[in-house]
Amino acid sequence: MRPLVIKLGGILLDTPAAMENLFNALAKYLQNSDRSLLIVHGGGCVVDDLMKRLNLPVRKKNGLRVTPSDQIDIIVGALAGIANKTLVAQAAKFKLNPVGLCLGDGELTAAKQFDPELGHVAGVIARNPALLDNLLSGGFLPIISSIAVDENGLLMNVNADQAATAIASLIDADLVMLSDVDGVLDADKTLLSELNSAQIARLIENKVITDGMIVKVNAALDAAKILNRGVDIANWKYPEKLTALFAGEIIGTRIAP
């Protein structure tokens, strides 16, 4: 099987019991599988909490966090520090051989600033898989934060969905986006197991997919097009289903390219 990139988001990083359930499911899955696994994470809730404790303002432009030079160190500390090492600690508890990384380590990705008005915010593309190839062949679990380094050596904040897509592209992996939603629901609130771009456009037009779910679905669709294969949206709240998900079964919604 291809390697599997698991993108973590939502309030999982703020929910210790959910993190424990996730890594317990990973450990159980790996008892009977030699599939290579990687985790990519953001951590907006961790950033917001730290900014609040430091009485720092949070500014956004078109839904994207503005990251000025005097705040990038705070965001790096939250994502590559607090969030990353919290996940590493939970994975270590289950003997998963975790290694905490960021997108800039080993030149995994190349980063380019999005918009000067957003500050230290960048997009990334896959660059050099050597570090991940070595770690995966050695039986390690890479846990990668969405902090990158640009060509000028500047630290950059990257959208975690795009970060996960770049890492999946780098090593030709499947991608699962874990969140606090079951998947995409139809007008009758029934879970839709598979969707393509035309169906998604119709559901958005008919206001069945709305608000934050539009962002999640479009992120998965963008990833599916880049990877040229289905990308799953699934819920981390059901640990009993996660081992099936890691094995390739659909438990949420699979977005086709």
Curated annotation (Swiss-Prot):
What molecular function does GO assign, one term?
acetylglutamate kinase activity
Provide the protein name: Acetylglutamate kinase
First-listed, main subcellular location of the protein, grouped into a coarse class: cytoplasm
What protein family is recorded? Belongs to the acetylglutamate kinase family. ArgB subfamily.
Instruction: Outline what the protein does.
Output: Catalyzes the ATP-dependent phosphorylation of N-acetyl-L-glutamate.
Which Gene Ontology cellular component annotation is one that this UniProt entry carries? Answer: cytoplasm
| Subcellular localization(s) per the UniProt record | Cytoplasm
Instruction: Identify the EC number(s).
Output: 2.7.2.8
Which residues make up the annotated site Transition state stabilizer? 7, 216
**An example Gene Ontology biological process:** L-arginine biosynthetic process
Coiled-coil ranges from the UniProt annotation: none
Superkingdom of this entry's organism?
A: Bacteria
Q: Binding positions for substrate?
A: 43-44, 65, 157
Catalysed conversion reaction: N-acetyl-L-glutamate + ATP = N-acetyl-L-glutamyl 5-phosphate + ADP
Pfam families xref list: AA_kinase (PF00696)
What pathway is this protein a component of?
A: Amino-acid biosynthesis; L-arginine biosynthesis; N(2)-acetyl-L-ornithine from L-glutamate: step 2/4
This protein's UniProt keywords: Amino-acid biosynthesis, Arginine biosynthesis, ATP-binding, Cytoplasm, Kinase, Nucleotide-binding, Transferase
Q: Which InterPro entries match?
A: AceGlu_kinase-like_sf, AcgluKinase_fam, ArgB, Asp/Glu/Uridylate_kinase, NAGK-NC
Q: Which HAMAP family match?
A: ArgB
